[in-house]
């Protein structure tokens, strides 16, 4: 039976629309930041026949799924649409949507679209091979994931789309447009196009002109947490929201996730442990890495930027290990009514720090300018089953994820001068108590784990609330609403063990990259254009 709601007046709830890589969600929060209801649907991105690397975003079908989620969330919450004070949207970064002169969305691609590899290579040769460096110094982005090569691909291969293009936005902005009929982008998400100036938080049209592309297709820029428009009558009929409800500018998923975690002040640091792991450090002013190893993104907090390093497929690697090798543990966990990862962590806790010298080779540290990884493998295995078994390999994977994170944080500190004294660990990985402790031991930092570990939707709801005056500011509200689950202090003895393990791993990984360079092994992943 649906829960009865005692608050029937307008304005007691906020809705966040969260468009992730694999699913879309509509999440309803109360004004204390508590999640009340969620509607969720998976979506698939479409590979276009004969277009290698393509991943188009199905605009018509995905809007239907978003509307389905909104209706489902309202039904689960058992509240009228008039109880929603405001709506905001967030999404995966890098995905873009193209609109024609009538404001109709005509083409879109997901963040994982890699069709423009040739265009990336072509663009790198511009300005005596300095164009990518110019893009990075201005925007904090390289060409691999930016919008510039994708627009060039459209000019080359889909001129029918390119010449009709009137506006480009991100996917979060598309959802807000479908609700309100208003087009704008925010800096945190649009920053990942490689076209936004980190200092001015506005478009750098000259970058498109340098690439020989049109510079008249850029949307207005509005800050996260400001009013975009209101729910249109058409959208109200499609998704059951109340016409006239304010629609507030949202943002990028990672930056809004940091807002929901209270990571809103200079030097605050977070490790977000999902399919990919992001290591994020807030900087008080825009600065880029002379070595171009890490990306720099606008935060949702005006005037602030974030350095962001990425560890590839960290969560996916753990899932692969569980599903490929741990069928017995999955069965036991199911019978015990616990999560299989919890059982594996319990087993791994009996393995000494350093995992008997086993070195997983999966994600490298981030090298944004020349971004590729070695072939997946385990190095330095033993044939002693007491020392080398599933528990050892599982612990080694957890340790390796922490080592890559520590290396990435070290890279950030080296060019920014910002040295963290603690970090926030969130996302699915932070559910593991052993993993949280290993992260503290490897980095030498105190690790804080929040109660709400998936905070992107909460950050989006905060933006909605600030936009209608429920809360005074993004930063103040993020700090106010975050609650902490536990704290992990680093063990100095373990830290010393991991320092040695880290040095060995870095040396071995370079040799493994050389095998990829020689064509002897296959990279875990390569950026387009390499």
Curated annotation (Swiss-Prot):
The keyword Kinase applies. Its EC number is 2.7.1.189. GO terms for biological process: carbohydrate metabolic process; quorum sensing. It holds the Pfam family FGGY_N. It catalyses: (S)-4,5-dihydroxypentane-2,3-dione + ATP = (2S)-2-hydroxy-3,4-dioxopentyl phosphate + ADP + H(+). It is an enzyme of class 2 (transferase). The keyword rRNA processing does not apply. GO terms for cellular component: cytoplasm. GO terms for molecular function: autoinducer-2 kinase activity. Keywords: Cytoplasm, Kinase, Transferase. It is found in: Cytoplasm. Belongs to the FGGY kinase family. NCBIfam families: PRK10939.1 (NF008187). Catalyzes the phosphorylation of autoinducer-2 (AI-2) to phospho-AI-2, which subsequently inactivates the transcriptional regulator LsrR and leads to the transcription of the lsr operon. Phosphorylates the ring-open form of (S)-4,5-dihydroxypentane-2,3-dione (DPD), which is the precursor to all AI-2 signaling molecules, at the C5 position. This is Autoinducer-2 kinase. It comes from Salmonella typhi. The gene is lsrK.
């Amino acid at each position: 039976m649906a829960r009865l709601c005692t608050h029937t007046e307008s304005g007691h709830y906020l809705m966040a629309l969260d468009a992730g890589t694999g699913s879309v969600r509509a999440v309803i929060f109360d004004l204390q930041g508590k999640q009340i209801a969620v509607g969720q649907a998976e979506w698939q991105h479409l590979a276009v026949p004969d277009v290698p690397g393509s991943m188009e975003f199905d605009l018509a079908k995905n809007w239907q799924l978003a509307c389905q989620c909104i209706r489902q969330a309202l039904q689960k919450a058992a509240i009228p649409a008039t109880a929603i004070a405001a709506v905001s949207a967030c999404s995966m970064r890098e995905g873009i949507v193209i609109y024609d002169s009538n404001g109709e969305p005509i083409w879109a691609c997901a963040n994982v679209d890699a069709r423009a590899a040739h265009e990336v290579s072509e663009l790198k040769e511009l300005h005596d091979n300095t164009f990518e460096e110019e893009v990075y110094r201005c925007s904090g982005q390289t060409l691999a994931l930016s919008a510039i090569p994708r627009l060039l691909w459209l000019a080359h291969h889909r001129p029918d789309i390119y010449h009709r293009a009137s506006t480009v936005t991100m996917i979060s902005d598309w959802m807000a447009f479908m609700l309100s009929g208003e087009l704008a982008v925010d800096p945190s998400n649009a920053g990942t196009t490689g076209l936004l100036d980190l200092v001015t938080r506005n478009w750098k049209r000259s970058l498109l002109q340098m690439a020989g592309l049109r510079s008249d297709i850029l949307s207005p820029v509005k800050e996260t947490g400001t009013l975009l428009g209101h729910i249109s009558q058409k959208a109200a009929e499609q998704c059951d929201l109340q016409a006239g409800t304010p629609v507030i500018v949202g943002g990028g998923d990672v930056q809004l996730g940091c807002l929901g975690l209270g990571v809103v002040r200079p030097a605050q640091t977070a490790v977000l442990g999902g399919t990919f792991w992001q290591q994020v450090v807030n900087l008080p002013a825009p600065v880029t890495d002379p070595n171009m190893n890490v990306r720099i993104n606008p935060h949702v907090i005006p005037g602030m930027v974030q350095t962001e390093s990425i560890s590839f497929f960290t969560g996916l690697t753990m899932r692969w290990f569980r599903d490929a090798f741990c069928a017995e543990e999955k069965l036991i966990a199911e019978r015990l009514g616990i999560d299989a990862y919890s059982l594996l962590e319990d087993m791994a806790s009996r393995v000494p720090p350093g995992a008997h010298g086993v070195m997983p080779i999966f994600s490298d540290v981030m090298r944004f300018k020349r971004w590729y990884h070695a072939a997946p493998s385990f190095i330095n295995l033993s044939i002693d089953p007491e020392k080398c078994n599933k528990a050892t390999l599982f612990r080694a994977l957890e340790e390796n994820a922490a080592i890559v994170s520590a290396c990435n944080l070290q890279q950030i500190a080296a060019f920014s001068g910002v040295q963290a004294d603690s970090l926030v660990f969130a996302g699915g990985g932070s559910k593991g108590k052993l993993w949280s402790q290993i992260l503290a031991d490897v980095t030498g930092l105190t690790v804080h784990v929040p109660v709400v570990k998936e905070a992107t939707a909460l950050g989006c709801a905060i933006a909605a609330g600030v936009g209608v005056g429920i809360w005074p500011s993004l930063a103040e509200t993020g700090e106010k609403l975050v609650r902490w689950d536990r704290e992990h202090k680093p063990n100095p003895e373990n830290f010393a063990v991991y320092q040695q393990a880290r040095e060995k791993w870095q040396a071995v990984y370079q040799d493994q990259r050389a095998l990829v360079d020689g064509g002897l092994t296959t990279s875990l992943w390569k950026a387009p254009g390499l």
